[in-house]
């Protein structure tokens, strides 16, 4: 995994604009992937960012880069707790819920629909998706409620990714790109 791939997939989380990003990471050697994640956690942990493999298959890891403190806050809202309880999450706290999510990812081939709650999707949009409502627009996720706010968020994420990729290419390292928080 390269830092370029990390920035392309996770710039909004590195910038502190969202809780987490999820991306598939091809690898040739499982131990090399885990070593890279350990190194990344040493470098970014002091900024409040962690990377964990949620699922590792033959040649691809599913990596979740996130801000634990923000995940804790996101998942503690009443609407998130209600949605998560529908899927058997009886956990309080981000790390316990993350463990449950990883277990669900390993047990099923498809993505668990509640995964959006771990990626800063609004709970009302996750619920709209689960209820098969007609969506208002599609960007980083399917939007079922506040279309204008979502479009602004999509534009912020896109601009952030563009700026971060440019800064990385100019030689700014990932630690300097990562906002503390």
What are these regions (language model features)?
Residues 1-57:
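A structured, charge-rich N-terminal accessory region that forms the first stable segment of a protein
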Residues 18-20, 59-61, 112-114:
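Short, surface-exposed beta-edge/turn micro-motifs
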Residues 36-93:
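A glycine-rich, hydrophobic loop/mini-helix early in the fold
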Residues 58-59, 98-101, 130-145:
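Short linear loop/turn motifs
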Residues 90-95, 123, 138-139:
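Short, surface-exposed acidic
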Residues 93-109:
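Helix-hairpin-helix/helix-loop-helix acidic hairpins
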Residues 111-137:
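Hydrophobic/aromatic-rich, well-ordered segments within soluble, folded domains that form packed cores
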Residues 139-181:
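Long, compositionally biased
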């Amino acid at each position: 995994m390269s830092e370029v791939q990390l920035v392309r997939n996770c710039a909004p989380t590195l910038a502190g604009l969202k809780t987490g990003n999820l991306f598939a990471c091809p690898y040739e050697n499982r131990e090399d992937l885990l070593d890279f994640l350990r190194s990344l956690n040493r470098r970014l942990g002091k900024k409040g960012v962690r990377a964990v493999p949620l699922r590792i298959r033959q040649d691809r890891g599913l990596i979740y880069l996130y801000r634990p403190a923000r995940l804790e806050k996101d998942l503690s809202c009443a609407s998130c707790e209600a949605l998560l309880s529908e899927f058997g999450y009886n956990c309080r706290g981000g790390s316990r819920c993350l463990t449950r999510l990883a277990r669900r990812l390993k047990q099923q081939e498809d993505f668990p629909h509640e995964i959006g709650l771990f990626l800063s999707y609004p709970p009302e949009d996750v619920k709209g998706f689960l209820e098969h409502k007609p969506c208002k627009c599609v960007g980083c996720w399917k939007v079922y409620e506040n279309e204008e706010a979502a479009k602004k968020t999509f534009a912020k994420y896109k601009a952030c990714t563009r700026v971060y990729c440019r800064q990385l290419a100019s030689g700014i390292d990932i630690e300097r790109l990562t906002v503390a928080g």
